[in-house]
A protein has these predicted regions:
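Conserved phosphate- and dinucleotide-binding cores of soluble alpha/beta proteins
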Residues: 1-310
Length: 310
């Protein structure tokens, strides 16, 4: 889906640049749906009319997603992460309520920058508040970079011909060697489970898929490459009304490992922060049990002893 054509004959794939540009480059014929409600964004997201074989026009409303409701658990996690983000940091914000909770805790920061996969309402709010300026970025200074957008109608209007925002293909935004050129890159992403070694299951639980492969591991590695960078994997300590611990001895068989133990840095729950990078198996296990829900710590400790980790 593309924006209306500009005076130079270009359409903008602003809301979903991601893989679309690569598909267009390889397509024998390009058919565009041109929607009058799609913003015209800047960046490497434009298709010239000469490349288009056919098009159809529509004015259907664009799918909207507002900011999620933030409860005390999400708020606590957000505060832990926000306290570790310095002024001038460049941020990658993943999808979900907890990353959004982090954004809401950043209103007292100064001169933050954005190099991310998804741009949403939380980022727009910080721009409007003067918190995000991109002034101290040393890679694409002055510009926010993203590959797709998901939010409200206000966000889509904010994107329209905004010189501070550029939309690029996902192989550009998510390249760890490019994103990692930002000093102080702080990557914030959610997961469903973390095991004693720090492996994260963000896409499936066992053989049941819940999400596709996103940019989590890309940006964890980018933050590891960044001078002063940090990556945060965030999750509530429990699921299903406190009946299941999300800190587990091992991931279920069949679980897709989204972030591996050798890449993980910080894991954050409402009970604190576990710093895992460079730590031994015993130290990782102790740190993760320390941020598990108190009702499960004894059980997890016994499991760790049986696994000869403690």
């Amino acid at each position: 889906m593309a924006s209306p054509m500009d005076e130079h004959g270009y359409f903008s794939l602003s809301l979903g640049t991601d893989y679309t540009m690569a598909a267009i480059e390889r397509a024998r014929a390009v058919v565009l749906e041109v929607n009058s409600n799609v913003p015209f964004a800047n960046g490497d997201c434009h298709v010239h009319i000469s490349r288009v074989a056919a098009l159809c026009e529509s004015d259907d409303p664009i799918f909207e997603v507002g900011l999620p409701k933030i409860g005390p658990v999400q708020e606590a996690i957000g505060k832990y992460v926000a306290d570790m983000i310095p002024d001038g940091a460049t941020l990658q914000i993943g999808y979900g309520g907890i990353p959004d909770a982090v954004v809401m805790q950043l209103t007292d920061k100064r001169d933050l920058g954005i190099h991310t996969e998804m741009v949403g309402d939380g980022i727009m709010t910080l721009v409007e508040a003067g918190v995000i300026t991109n002034r101290r970025k040393n890679y694409h200074q002055g510009k926010m970079l993203a590959t797709f957008a998901l939010g409200s109608k206000k966000l889509y209007q904010f994107m329209n011909r905004n010189p501070a925002l550029e939309m690029h293909p996902v192989d550009f935004t998510n390249d760890p060697f490019l994103a990692g050129q930002n000093d102080n890159l702080h990557a914030i992403n959610a997961t469903m489970q973390v095991d004693f070694m720090g492996q994260c299951g963000s896409e499936s639980l066992g053989y049941t898929p819940y999400s596709g492969t996103g940019g989590q591991s890309d940006f964890v590695r980018a933050a590891n490459r960044s001078n002063g960078g940090k990556s945060f994997i965030v999750l509530p300590s429990t699921a299903k009304n406190d009946t299941i611990s999300r800190i587990v001895p091992t991931l279920q068989p069949g679980t897709h490992v989204s972030t591996g133990k050798n890449d993980i840095n910080y894991v954050v729950t409402e009970y604190g922060v576990a710093q895992l990078r460079g730590k031994s198996a015993k130290q990782r296990c102790q740190a993760l049990i320390g941020i598990a829900h108190p009702d499960f710590r004894g059980e997890l400790h016994e499991m760790a002893k049986k696994m000869k980790l403690l």
